[in-house]
Curated annotation (Swiss-Prot):
GO cellular component: cytoplasm
Complex formation: Heterotrimer of UreA (gamma), UreB (beta) and UreC (alpha) subunits. Three heterotrimers associate to form the active enzyme.
Family in the record: Belongs to the urease gamma subunit family.
EC number(s) stated in the UniProt entry for this protein: 3.5.1.5
The protein's name in its UniProt record: Urease subunit gamma
Transmembrane helix is among the record's keywords: no
Tree of life domain: Bacteria
Organism: Staphylococcus carnosus (strain TM300)
Length: 100
């Protein structure tokens, strides 16, 4: 089986999301890469499920809050951009202040 670089990146994101969710379920606060992985994964899956860019931009701000992440992490992510594949093509999802 051969994966393209994009497919490998998506698989790594799935693994990072899984690890971050397991740590979160143990009561640990998320670090920067873990927070980005969770939000990015949810955006990709939402696009796959057929949600619109506008819906995902709104949903992206509801996934995590400051209590979920280590101190300072929310300030490190002023904007998050995720390129996702929608039924009508690839689009860029921009989430302003994803962790509030």
């Amino acid at each position: 089986m051969h994966f393209t670089q994009r497919e490998q990146d998506k698989l790594m994101l799935v693994v990072a999301n899984d690890l971050a969710r397991r740590r979160q379920s143990r009561g640990l606060k998320l670090n920067y890469p873990e927070a980005v992985a969770i939000i990015s994964y949810e955006m990709l899956e939402g696009a796959r499920d057929g949600k619109s860019v506008a819906e995902l931009m709104s949903y992206g701000r509801q996934i995590l809050n400051k209590d979920d992440v280590m101190e300072g992490v929310s300030d490190m992510i002023p904007d998050l951009e995720i390129e996702a594949t929608f039924p009508d093509g690839t689009k860029l999802i921009t989430i302003h202040h994803p962790i509030v």
